Amino acid sequence: MANYTAADVKKLRELTGAGMMDCKKALDEAEGNVEKAVEALRIKGQKGVAKREGRSAENGAVVSIIADDNSSGVLVELKCETDFVAKGEKFQNVATAIAEHVAKAAPADLDALLASEIEAGKTVQAFVDEANANLGEKIVLDRFAQFADGYVLAYMHRTMPDLPPQIGVLVELDKPNAEVAKGVAQHIAAFAPKYLSKEDVRPDVVESERRIAEETTRAEGKPEAAIAKIVEGRVNGFFKDATLLGQPYALDNKKSVQKVLDEAGVTLKRFTRIKVGI
C-alpha cells in the first residue's frame, strides 16, 4: 500500500514539474518522503537531459521587461513541452530571470546570450540546462528581442486564462505616447503583420508575390489586356495584408495604422511580435 497521498503527488509535481507516474515512482522509492523524492527526481533529471534532446518543445511563455521610463524593453520566448510546466511558477521564474539578464547584459545575438553569465560561473546555457533537468522537460531558449532607442512598450496576450502569455509584442515610438503604443501593439498581436511598411519588404519577396499573382490570374483565364492591372491590384493587396502601416486599425477600422500615428504626431520606428512555437 502506498505510504503517500494524492496531495503528496501534486506537491511533488509542483516542486519538480515531473510527470505524475515519475512522481509516484519516486515517492514509492523514497517511502513517501517528499524531500527524498525531489532529490531522486533531480538526479534522474540530470541523466535524462540528453534523452529529451529529440523531443519537441512547443509550449512555453513570452516574458517582457520594460524600463520604468520606457526607454528600453525586452521580450524573451522560453519553450517547454507541456502546458503543465508552462504555467508553473518555477518555469516562469526561469523565463523572467533570463529576460532580466537580457535587459542588463544587452547581448548582441542568441549565441552571445547563451554564452553570457547569468550568475557567477554559470552561463545562460547552463542555466537553461539546469531548468531542463529540474523540470523534467526539454526547455528551449531560441528567441529574444531588445529595443533601446525610443519610447518602448510591450503588450502581452494570453491565449488561455490559466497559461502565461503566449504572444508578446514590443513597439518602439520616436516619442512618448502610451495610448497609441498600446493600441498599435494590440493591433500587431491580433493581425500579425510581417513588415512595417512596403519599403521593408525584400525585392525577392515582392517579385515572388508578383509572379504568383500573374500565374493565378492567367490560370483564371482573365483577358490578356487586363492581366497587368489585376496583378498590380493583387500585389497591392499583399502589401495591405502584410505591412502594418497600411492595415485598417483594429480599434478604428475607418483609419489605417499610418493615419492613427500621423494624427498622434508619432512615428513607429520598429516592432516585433513573438508567439510561442511560431
Swiss-Prot record:
CDD domains: UBA_EF-Ts. It is found in: Cytoplasm. The keyword DNA-binding does not apply. Coiled coil: none annotated. One of its GO terms (cellular component) is cytoplasm. Its main location: cytoplasm. It holds the Pfam family EF_TS. GO terms for molecular function: translation elongation factor activity. Residues 82-85 are annotated as: Involved in Mg(2+) ion dislocation from EF-Tu. Gene3D superfamilies: 1.10.286.20, DNA helicase RuvA subunit, C-terminal domain (1.10.8.10), Elongation factor Ts, dimerisation domain (3.30.479.20). The keyword rRNA processing does not apply. Associates with the EF-Tu.GDP complex and induces the exchange of GDP to GTP. It remains bound to the aminoacyl-tRNA.EF-Tu.GTP complex up to the GTP hydrolysis stage on the ribosome. Belongs to the EF-Ts family. This is Elongation factor Ts.
